[in-house]
Every structure is written in C-alpha cells, then in structure tokens.
Swiss-Prot record:
Protein name: Omega-lycotoxin-Am1b
Organism of derivation: Alopecosa marikovskyi (Wolf spider)
Source domain of life: Eukaryota
Extra remark beyond the main annotation: According to the nomenclature proposed by King and colleagues (2008), 'Gsp(267)' comes from the species name 'Geolycosa sp (strain A267TDLS2-KZARNA)'. This species has been reclassified since that study, as indicated in the work of Oparin and colleagues (2016).
Primary role: Modulates Cav2.1/CACNA1A voltage-gated calcium channels (P/Q-type currents) in rat cerebellar Purkinje cells and hippocampal CA1-CA3 neurons. At saturating concentrations (>10 nM) decelerates activation kinetics and slightly increases peak amplitude without affecting deactivation kinetics. In vivo, does not cause death when intravenously injected into mice. In rat models, through its activity on Cav2.1/CACNA1A, has an ameliorative effect on memory defects provoked by hyperstimulation of N-methyl-D-aspartate receptors (NMDARs) in the hippocampus.
C-alpha cells in the first residue's frame, strides 16, 4: 500500500515538473542572447581620445563623456579622456 502511494506521488511529481524543464530550456536560450550584446558593450566601453568617431553607435543608449586631466602631479600638460557612460 505504501509503495503504491509512493509511486502515485512520484508520477504526479514527474508530471507536474515536466513543463518546468521545458521552461528552463527556453530561459537558457534567452539568456545566451544578452551575453553576445554584453560582449559588444564591453568592447565599446573603452577610453577614447574624442567622441567624434563613435563607431557603430557604441555609446548608444549611453553617452560619450569627455574631460581633461593632468598627466601627472608635477606636470601642467593635460590630456583629453573620453568614455561611454550611463550617466
């Protein structure tokens, strides 16, 4: 009797969980797509000398931000740095 109850519950659990396995496979496919886009975004977020040549809209939807900074503490020479940023 206990064995038959066990098998009934076992098969109910399998039947109940089966759609979940299919959902997991669909989620895995959806999760791989943003990874490719994320790799492109990482290559776009680099230091630049200007925002003039924003290759293939790398900064979109972000913006390219530029500023000047001194090369070292004792130097008066400044260099321009640009970077894609969310803010």
């Amino acid at each position: 009797m206990k064995l038959s109850i066990f098998f009934v519950l076992f098969f109910i659990a399998i039947a109940y969980c089966q759609p979940e396995f299919l959902d997991d496979e669909e989620d895995e496919v959806e999760e791989t797509l943003p990874v490719a886009e994320e790799g492109r975004e990482r290559s776009c977020i680099t230091w630049r000398n200007s925002c003039m040549h924003n290759d293939k809209g790398c900064c979109f939807p972000w913006s390219c931000v530029c500023w000047s900074q001194t090369v070292s503490r004792n130097s008066s020479r400044k260099e321009k740095k640009c970077q894609c940023r969310l803010w």
